């Protein structure tokens, strides 16, 4: 049976950027990695009602910079920026270095795989029929300009005794084309019958040229030595 590779993992460095960008030596690498995990876990729990898409973490010169991508920036910022200041203080305490929080608004949540998956899972938890939730998500994405979308749900659908998976696709969703901009994410719906898994693939078009290259500083070239006998 043919299995599907993770669409984000196969495109890392080609059309997908890393969610954590920093360099560390052998001593600090594990601590930084665990710190990233803790920060993401903390923010996901705190901002579960803020339509969180993704969290990117950078570590420039003994500090940490966290960018929160959300469809509802007002919920994250809070009244007069009180909530975001509390988050900044908590993250600085967790990381042990000064923290900076940037907020990036997701303009079209219907074209963000994570937000679409979370929306479907919340509908399933509210006992909306799974086919209706899937079809609505697909129609909204196609209406807003997606080239293709595939939605898959798996589990005890409709309270059935035997678990199964169903999927719905519209348009093109090329899984092997590396230059294809595929946004992929998953979510879980916790229902009275058990957990229902939700997977969403959204094809937004092809990226020509890939990611911008990181230009390294060129070392001064050494003068060429003349070979003997010339």
Curated annotation (Swiss-Prot):
<dbReference type="GO" id="GO:0003729">
    <property type="term" value="F:mRNA binding"/>
</dbReference>
<comment type="subunit">
    <text>Part of the 30S ribosomal subunit. Forms a tight complex with proteins S10 and S14.</text>
</comment>
<comment type="function">
    <text>Binds the lower part of the 30S subunit head. Binds mRNA in the 70S ribosome, positioning it for translation.</text>
</comment>
<dbReference type="GO" id="GO:0022627">
    <property type="term" value="C:cytosolic small ribosomal subunit"/>
</dbReference>
<dbReference type="GO" id="GO:0003735">
    <property type="term" value="F:structural constituent of ribosome"/>
</dbReference>
<dbReference type="InterPro" id="IPR001351">
    <property type="entry name" value="Ribosomal_uS3_C"/>
</dbReference>
<dbReference type="InterPro" id="IPR036419">
    <property type="entry name" value="Ribosomal_S3_C_sf"/>
</dbReference>
<keyword id="KW-0699">rRNA-binding</keyword>
<keyword id="KW-0687">Ribonucleoprotein</keyword>
<dbReference type="InterPro" id="IPR015946">
    <property type="entry name" value="KH_dom-like_a/b"/>
</dbReference>
<feature type="domain" description="KH type-2">
    <location>
        <begin position="39"/>
        <end position="107"/>
    </location>
</feature>
<dbReference type="InterPro" id="IPR004044">
    <property type="entry name" value="KH_dom_type_2"/>
</dbReference>
<dbReference type="GO" id="GO:0006412">
    <property type="term" value="P:translation"/>
</dbReference>
<keyword id="KW-0689">Ribosomal protein</keyword>
<comment type="similarity">
    <text>Belongs to the universal ribosomal protein uS3 family.</text>
</comment>
<keyword id="KW-0694">RNA-binding</keyword>
<dbReference type="InterPro" id="IPR004087">
    <property type="entry name" value="KH_dom"/>
</dbReference>
<dbReference type="InterPro" id="IPR018280">
    <property type="entry name" value="Ribosomal_uS3_CS"/>
</dbReference>
<dbReference type="Pfam" id="PF07650">
    <property type="entry name" value="KH_2"/>
</dbReference>
<dbReference type="InterPro" id="IPR009019">
    <property type="entry name" value="KH_sf_prok-type"/>
</dbReference>
<dbReference type="Pfam" id="PF00189">
    <property type="entry name" value="Ribosomal_S3_C"/>
</dbReference>
<dbReference type="InterPro" id="IPR005704">
    <property type="entry name" value="Ribosomal_uS3_bac-typ"/>
</dbReference>
<dbReference type="GO" id="GO:0019843">
    <property type="term" value="F:rRNA binding"/>
</dbReference>
<protein>
    <recommendedName>
        <fullName>Small ribosomal subunit protein uS3</fullName>
    </recommendedName>
</protein>
């Amino acid at each position: 049976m043919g299995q599907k590779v993770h669409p984000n993992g196969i495109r890392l460095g080609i059309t997908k950027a890393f969610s954590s960008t920093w360099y560390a030596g052998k001593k600090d690498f594990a601590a930084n990695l665990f710190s990233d995990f803790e920060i993401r876990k903390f923010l996901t729990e705190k901002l579960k009602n803020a339509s969180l898409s993704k969290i990117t973490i950078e570590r420039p010169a003994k500090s940490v910079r966290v960018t929160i991508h959300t469809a509802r920036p007002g919920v994250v910022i809070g009244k007069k920026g009180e909530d975001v200041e509390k988050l900044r203080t908590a993250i600085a305490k967790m990381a042990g270095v000064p923290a900076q929080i940037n907020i990036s608004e997701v303009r079209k949540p219907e074209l963000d795989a994570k937000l679409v998956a979370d929306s479907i899972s919340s509908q399933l938890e509210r006992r909306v029929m799974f086919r209706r939730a899937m079809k609505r998500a697909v129609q909204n994405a196609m209406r807003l300009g997606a080239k293709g979308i595939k939605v898959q749900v798996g589990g005890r659908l409709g309270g059935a005794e035997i678990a199964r998976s169903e999927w719905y696709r519209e348009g093109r969703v090329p899984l092997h084309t590396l230059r294809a901009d595929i946004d992929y994410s998953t979510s879980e719906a916790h229902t009275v019958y058990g957990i229902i898994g939700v997977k969403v693939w959204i094809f937004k078009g092809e990226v020509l040229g890939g990611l911008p290259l990181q230009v390294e500083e060129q070392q001064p070239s050494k003068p060429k030595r003349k070979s003997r006998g010339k």
